[in-house]
C-alpha cells in the first residue's frame, strides 16, 4: 500500500519524465486560453467606449465567443479523453504517458467523460435544488416553513459539494477502467473514500492553488494597473491585450499539468485500494 508522499512524488516524476509528450495538451489548452483572454480584454476595453454601438459589439463578441466555445469544447473533449488514457494506464502500472493517437477515440471518450461529470452534478445537486425551489415558493405560504426548507437545502448543498468533490475524482478513474457506468458505482466508490484519500485530495488542492496563484498573480497585478490607462494610449492597449492573452494562456497551460498531476495521484490511490499490481 503506497503512502500519500509516494503518490505525490510519483505524479511529479511522471510529469517531469513525460513533459514533452504532455506538452501537446498544454499547448492546446494555452491556445484556447489565449483566445479567451484576448476576447475578454477587448470586451473590457471597448464596452467602456460610449461612442460604440453596444449592441453591435455584443453581437460580434457573441459570435466570436460561440466560435471559441466550440473550439474549447472540442479541445476539452480531446484532453478529457487523454486524461482517461492517463488514468487507465496508471492503474495498469505504466509510467510512460500514452500517445496522442486515434483522435476519434479521444473525442469519444472525452465526450463521455464530460457527460458523466455533468450527470454526476445533476444527481448530487438535484435534491438541494428542488428543496431550495420549494423553499422559495413556500415563503408565500409560510415564512417559517419556507425559511426552514431554504436552510435545509443550503446545508444539503454544502454536503453535496463536498461529497461530489471526493466522489467524482475516484469515479473518473473508475470510468477509465470500467467504462461509462463506472461513474455510477456509488456504493463501491464511496467505500474507497477514507482518511488517507481525503488528506491526499486536500493536499493536491492546496498544491494546485498555490502554484496557480504564483503563476497568474504577477500578470494579474500588472493587468490591473495597465487597464486604467489602456484606453487612452494605443501602446498600452496592445500591452493590456497581450498580457491578458498571455495570462490566460499561461494559466491554462499550467492547469493542464496540474490536472495530470491530480488524476495521476488519485489513480495511484485507486490502484492500491483495488489491490492491482
Curated annotation (Swiss-Prot):
Keywords: Cell membrane, Membrane, Transmembrane, Transmembrane helix. It is found in: Cell membrane. The chain crosses the membrane at residues 23-43, 61-81, 117-137, 144-164, 197-217, 221-241, 243-263. It is a multi-pass membrane protein. One of its GO terms (cellular component) is plasma membrane. Pfam families: DUF4013. Its main location: membrane. To M.jannaschii MJ1189. This is Uncharacterized protein MJ0233. It comes from Methanocaldococcus jannaschii (strain ATCC 43067 / DSM 2661 / JAL-1 / JCM 10045 / NBRC 100440). The lineage of its organism: Archaea, Methanobacteriati, Methanobacteriota, Methanomada group, Methanococci.
